[in-house]
Regions:
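Glycine-rich phosphate-binding P-loop
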Residues: 1
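Conserved RecA-like ASCE P-loop NTPase motor core of nucleic-acid helicases/translocases
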Residues: 7-11
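Hydrophobic multi-pass inner-membrane translocation pores used for secretion
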Residues: 5, 29-31
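P-loop NTPase motor domains
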Residues: 15-26, 33-35, 40-182
């Protein structure tokens, strides 16, 4: 790693790489319900999706995330339409500002769901409340870690059973964001 320009991204389920990453000046991102480190599940850069409309691809991700947040059940057509509409709405200002400024969060997304008239929107908002305003809201806040370091270690040891599927989705999406930037 020291002799190349390559970026190295590690997903560490057993906390085996922390000492090495620290010694090499990398960023260790501890992910858990109680960690002060946060990755915004809705982070998105201009290149997200490799040339396609980033919001369309992010909407697909948010649908997958909502499926996990709701309990792994498949979303119906109405729910998908509502999620797609709300995703486009919360990203509108960010997109109009050429993907600069404050990135929306899952809290913004939930607030947008609550503005909708359909009862299904209220149901989705209630189902994701634990992950936006409750004790498992670690992915509903602005990112406060350096995801641009050449060496990143996502430490997922303390993620826990409830957050593991969601955490893996968010970590992989964060990595996609990083890869498409390059």
């Amino acid at each position: 790693i020291l002799a190349s320009n390559a970026d190295v991204i590690i997903i560490d389920p057993e906390r085996e790489y922390s000492a090495l990453v620290k010694a090499l000046g990398g960023e260790i991102i501890n992910i858990s319900a109680t960690s002060p480190s946060h990755i915004n599940a809705m982070d998105m850069n201009k290149e997200y999706g490799d040339g396609a409309n980033p919001v369309i691809l992010k909407s697909e991700f948010i649908m997958s995330l909502c499926e996990q947040l709701i309990g792994g059940n498949n979303l119906g057509a109405k729910q998908k339409s509502i999620i797609d509409r709300c995703t486009a709405s919360v990203y509108r200002t960010y997109q109009q500002n050429d993907y600069t400024g404050t990135v929306p969060t899952l809290q913004d997304f939930r607030a947008e769901l609550l503005k909708q008239d359909e009862p299904e929107a209220k149901e989705i908002a209630l189902a994701i409340e634990l992950f936006t305003h409750g004790s498992l809201n670690t992915f509903a806040k602005q990112t406060n870690v350096d995801t641009n370091n050449r060496l990143i270690c996502y430490d997922i040891l303390d993620l826990g059973k409830q957050l593991m599927p969601i955490g893996m989705l968010v970590v992989l999406d964060s990595i996609l964001n990083r890869i498409t930037q390059n």
